Amino acid sequence: IAHWNLWTWLNNLIPLAETEQKEQFKEALAACLEEFEPTFIEHYTTGLCKKMGLPHFHKDSTECGLSFLRILQTEQLDYTQSFIRLQNKEYKVLRDDCLDIRQFDAFLTQYENIREHQDTDELDANMQEANPIYILRNHMAQRAIEAAERDDFSEVDRLFKLLNHPYTRQPDLEKPEDLGPLPSDVPDVAVSCSS
């Protein structure tokens, strides 16, 4: 999607070029696009490996990371909380959340095999830098908005402080509902891109 968006945006720039320079401009844009995909993939896989606590140079790290993402999608698990559980080595909790136990067990075996002979202190530090504990969720924002509409800005202030340091546990500021999605029996707040 990012590649297509960039291609579309760059093609909209072509009419801005002088007539005699349009071919050169098109060639320059094509060269930029050729560099985009490998650069994007490199940054994406590096980021994924950091989130997973895996060494980027290991031949199986990217596939292991993609396997975990497939599990999150298939099992409809919370992305943020699943990465925090992986970071905290809460493998049993993650496993218990899965219907396809064999898929999770295969992932975990591969994951542990990759990490087995690595400097896990460094990899764990990478995970902590890449996985926020707190993210602004719709229900959190809605709660703050509703309070602010009543001229009570305490929730806005609390969220501002909490989200200012999303990678650090803040038990004095957090509420249980800050740590994950609402339970399925509580209606979620739907928002649009223009909200």
Describe the function of each predicted region.
Residues 1-195:
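Regulatory N- and C-terminal appendages and interdomain linkers associated
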